[in-house]
Structures are given as structure tokens and as C-alpha cells.
Amino acid sequence: MTISHDFVIIKAERFKMLAGAAMKIPIRKPKNRRKAMIFEKQVVNGYKGMMHTRCDDTETVFYFSSDDFAGLQKEAYAFQSSMGHTLQGYLYFYDNFTKDRLIIFDHGFGGGHRAYMKEIEKLCAHGYRVFAYDHTGCMESGGASPNGLAQSLCDLNDCITTIKADECFAGLDISVMGHSWGAFSTLNIAALHPEISHIVALCGFVSVEEMMNTFFAGPLKGYRKAVLALEQESNPQFFSYNAVESLKNANVKALLIYSEDDKLCRRVHYDILEEGLKDKENVHFLLEKNKGHNPNYTTDAVKLLGEFGKARAKFAKKKNATKEEKARFIASFDWHKMTAQDESVWGKIFAHFDK
């Protein structure tokens, strides 16, 4: 295929790297306190390297853009975060979009909003106008790092606060859709903005603490406290948010979508939410099979994505790859097939948003 843009779709790449790195950490019980402190520092530094380092373009994956969809329009819209950073976003829409609705799309970790152009375009094609932005420390936005797992909720709160204060958006019905890191914020945003009408969360983790339980389990459990302390220090205002508590007290129409074989946001998150919210008539669940961390993709796309991940890990071992070599690498994959969307899942998403 002809490459005319730089596309990225590996949203959870750094989560995967963290999980792999964690398994390489020595798990022998240190013989003395000094060694224990050294190991703990290695773990925290490794975590910082994965989760507190800017997410910029690696030039080894693709990003779709609005230019790849005939008639799709975009308008730049930036806002200031409470941390003082400029967060860059864009309004996406086709002609004759629904004037009284706005859907905010919240991206996952490891890239920016353009990793989700297929999802954004589908929402626009259905008649919605979509606002999508890059989080702190990601792609086009400012910030030295993404500042940990709770930062997505901080940024989404700033985003909605800005939109509500802008007369250009006065009176709009606001909904939110997010994936993974962005689904965590989506799950919790109604606690901060109860007027949000609809949310769709794809593979959202319940809380920062529950996500750490996933990464630092078994022999690694002893390192969890130090990493949680880092997360709390990085974002004390939003660290403790829990999706069960946020949704238990909310009236927002919620659709929570997961895949039973997700190795990043594991089935336990679905189970906790389903049990904790079983009496909430406004909260609905969808559990897919064989979809990994992308339940809105087709099963074939998920398989291709997995094959790409393995190939990319191998390619990453090549030292000092040139731009030409990177271009040839990404040109060897069919990115449309790798990002194919499951129409059945999207039918349920649209039915939910259209209520």
C-alpha cells in the first residue's frame, strides 16, 4: 500500500512493555534491607521509564489522519490544562452533523488521539461531531511526561471544564468515549461532571490501584506499594477515583465493553464492575471473545495486530534504523485490515449513543 501519512494504532504498547519488563525484575527475596531498597528503586525507575516518559512518534507504526477519509473535516482546538500545559485537540465532523451533540474521544496510553482515527471517523459518519485531543506528555500536547495513570482523568476534567465554559459549545449534550487509559477517565468522569449524558468505555480499568494489582502480582506484589506511592504523588487529586463508586452514584447512560481474553485490562476489571453495578439499570455491559485489548476490532484485525506487535519487537532490536528502513517496515503491513472495525459491536455502540 502507498504510505502518505504517519499512522499509529498500538495504543497499549507501553503497557505491554511494562508487563514484559516486570517479569524480568529479580524476584528472589533480597538478603538484606539495602538490597531490597535497590531492587525497589529499580522497579520504580523501570516503571517511570514506561509510564512517565513522553509518548511521541516512533516512526515504526502508522497514524491515519482526516485526509484519509473523503469529506471528513477537522478544526484545531487547544486548551490549557490545570498543570499549565497546552493540550492540542481537534473537532472532527462531516457536513450536516448533529448540531446539539458532541462526543469527546479519550485515547489510550502510548500514543495520541490519531491512533483512533478509525473509531473517530465511524462516530462522525454516524452524524456526530467528535472532539479528540492528545493527553499531557503525548504527541502534539505539552508536558514532559504523561504523568502516570490518573492523568487521563485530570486531562478529561480540564477538557470538559473548558468546553462547558466556551460559548461556542453552549447547550450541547456531551458524551464521552474512551479506550484503556482513556476508558479509566471515561468511567469516572460522571463523578466530576454529572451532566454527561452517555459514556462508552472500551477496556477501562477500575482504578489505578486495581491496575497495579495486575502489573505487580505474585512475587512482584512487594513492589506495588512503592509504585502506588509514585502514582499518588504524581496525581493526588485523581489517584483514588474508582469506577464502581463513580458510576454507582451517577445517572449517566453507560456502556462498558471488554474482551474476556484481554491481557492488559484483565477480566477482573469487568467482573468487579459487573458485580458492583449489577443494580444500576443505566449501566450495560458487553463482553467480547478473542478480541484482546481491542473489543471493537474484528477478530482477524486483532490477530494481525498481534503479528505486527511481534514483528515490531523484532524490528526494534535493529540498531539505528534509518527513516527509509522504518518506512519499508510499516509499508509491509495492511493497516486497513489491521484496524478493521467490528460492525456488530459498533451497532451496539450507536444504539447506545442514540438513546
What is the meaning of each model-derived region?
Residues 26-80, 88-90, 312-326:
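An N-terminal hydrophobic leader/cap segment in hydrolases
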Residues 109-121, 268:
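The serine-hydrolase catalytic nucleophile loop
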Residues 123-142:
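Conserved alpha/beta-hydrolase
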Residues 146-167:
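Alpha/beta-hydrolase active-site loop
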Residues 188-236:
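Hydrolase active-site cap/lid region
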Residues 250, 256-258, 262:
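Short beta-strand/loop motif that positions the catalytic acidic residue
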Residues 252, 266-276, 300:
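Short alpha-helix in the alpha/beta-hydrolase fold that links the catalytic acid
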Residues 281-355:
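C-terminal catalytic histidine-bearing segment of alpha/beta-hydrolase fold enzymes
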